[in-house]
Amino acid sequence: MSVPAQNKSLFLESKFGQFAVRSTETPKPGPDEILVKVEATALNPLDWKVQSWGLFVEKYPAVLGFDAAGTIAQVGADIPPSSFVVGDRVIAQGWYDATKQTTVGMFTQYVVVPYKFVAKIPASVSFEDAATIPSGVATSAFPLYNQNATAPSVKLTAPWLEGGRGKYAGKPFLVLAGASSMGQFVIQFARLAGFSPIITTASPHNASLLQALGATHVLDRNLPSDQLIAEATKIAGGQFEVVYDAVSVPETLPLGYALTAQGGSLVVVLPADELMEKAKEDGKSVHMAHGLFITPVNHDIGRTLLDALPSLLESGDIKPNPVEILPGGLNGVVGGLERLKDNKVSGVKLVVRPQETA
């Protein structure tokens, strides 16, 4: 596969700054890396938060974007052909380096990634659909199923591992914000693990989507908290041993905590330090989701998930998020991030095609 000398990327030019598309030299893979031609990349709320809130990144200009799908354009010299070859269809995840305060982002036409953190995708899954998967499956699965002793996790048995499928039959499970990207994947993994009933909150127009993914009950997210608590506990027969708050905003955190049983676990996706301290006093656990494959504590569980993903996707056991494709290639990202920031996206993942960048 021929690779151009120049590569267009969307740069965040400075902290709290503006985005701009520029051309730079196309990167080359090291011995244990692959070069991916990015055919589709998905937008995440974290992307606008890095820009607006100044999170994580201190070295600019920086390329953001955490989810991509594409074709392998080059492979490093040390990669066995049995693993990956040029032309393979794959998904990859961007990341930030907490020590260096830098990013490796997917808002680009070509990206170099370590081959150990890449998964193949079946021909039945489009690049656009596949781009919704990496961070969604990681952030939903790791805080539930990571067995590493130091991991912030509920430490359930993963449903893609031996003994995990259907293991938790008859146990209720609660997902707040089920129509979010992560919420959709949490529902699916809970279904595979056997949890029932699976109760979620969402806007009523997303109910049929979430029921198709495995939710048994969809409660209107706009109901008052006391009514939601009453409805959820009535269905479940009490509080929940496991609650996943897929947005973790001030409106949902108290709700999720109130519905978590003593001895139970609440998973959050944004820092909730005060709640974590309160949980220690109340005999509950609050786990902060960390959904990067490249983080060492996630390596073991991440490897098993990446290995299992092709068959999970092929069988339909895991379905990607519904997508909305934004026009203009990388130039469409900024408008999409504004919509995410204004909470004007529901039930779909925004995706762009970097190769269409003018």
What kind of feature is each model-predicted range?
Residues 2, 297-358:
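C-terminal hydrophobic helical "lid"/dimerization subdomain
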Residues 161-169, 217-295:
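Glycine-rich cofactor phosphate-binding loops and adjacent beta1-alpha1 units
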Residues 131-223:
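Mid-domain Rossmann-like dinucleotide-binding core that forms the NAD(H)/NADP(H) cofactor-binding site
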Residues 31, 83-86, 139, 169, ...:
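Short, flexible surface segments
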Residues 1-19, 29-32, 54, 154-166, ...:
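Eukaryotic N-terminal targeting leaders
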Residues 2, 25-42, 52-99, 104-105, ...:
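Glycine-rich beta-strand-centered segment in the early N-terminal region that forms part
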